[in-house]
From Swiss-Prot:
Pfam families named among the record's database cross-references: RNase_HII
Organism of this sequence: Xanthomonas campestris pv. campestris (strain B100)
UniProt-listed Enzyme Commission number(s): 3.1.26.4
Predominant subcellular localization, coarse grouping: cytoplasm
Gene name tied to this protein: rnhB
Protein name, UniProt field: Ribonuclease HII
Amino acid sequence: MTRSSSDRAIVVPAAQNALFTDSPFPTPDSRLIAGVDEAGRGPLAGPVAVAAVVFDPAKPRINGLDDSKQLSAERREQLYARIVDRALAWSVVLIDSEEIDRINIYQATMLGMRRAVEGVAHVAGFARIDGNRVPKGLPFPAEALIGGDALDRAIMAASIVAKVTRDRLMRELHAQHPEYRFDLHKGYSTPAHLAALQTHGPCPQHRRSFAPVRRALGLETAQTAWDVPCAPADGLLLAE
């Protein structure tokens, strides 16, 4: 696990949780809600990032929150700094491409959500998760909220933290694999990325369970991520 000295951002491997907190509470408070969202389910390369954010009710409200997809990169960075400064607790989990290929992207997202929630379980007592599924094995009750990243402020904050964390990592991966231009498309399936994939083949960051990557490998059957057989991970991945 690494921590940036300038902004306290945390990057973690798939097997770990990450947490930053200034919590004054010794035990969880059922009135405090963790917003949970992911970034990077669809790309052909890189991890899926899941964040959980619990706002500090004693700190000022953050203005300008929105779904991260509706914000410019510059605005996301600005809001990210405010979120991690004013949050009571926040966590970010990255599930890497190898784990995604092993258990599939859906299960990897469920795993990331559970680990992200566990990272703030010492202060929160309820989770509100963007989407229509709640992973099993959470430490406290939760609900799924379709379109939550446009409706709930804590989910909006989680979407921003997840997106900024992942985008920063993809820029770092660009330095290792400049031929793919991860800094521009962040691993998504753009024409330029597909062309680079055909020219250079996949790198270790590519998700081999995704059809375009499989085609670049010359496999006859290009299975999509959800067609690939799943292996269990911690036994707690299936959604309720």
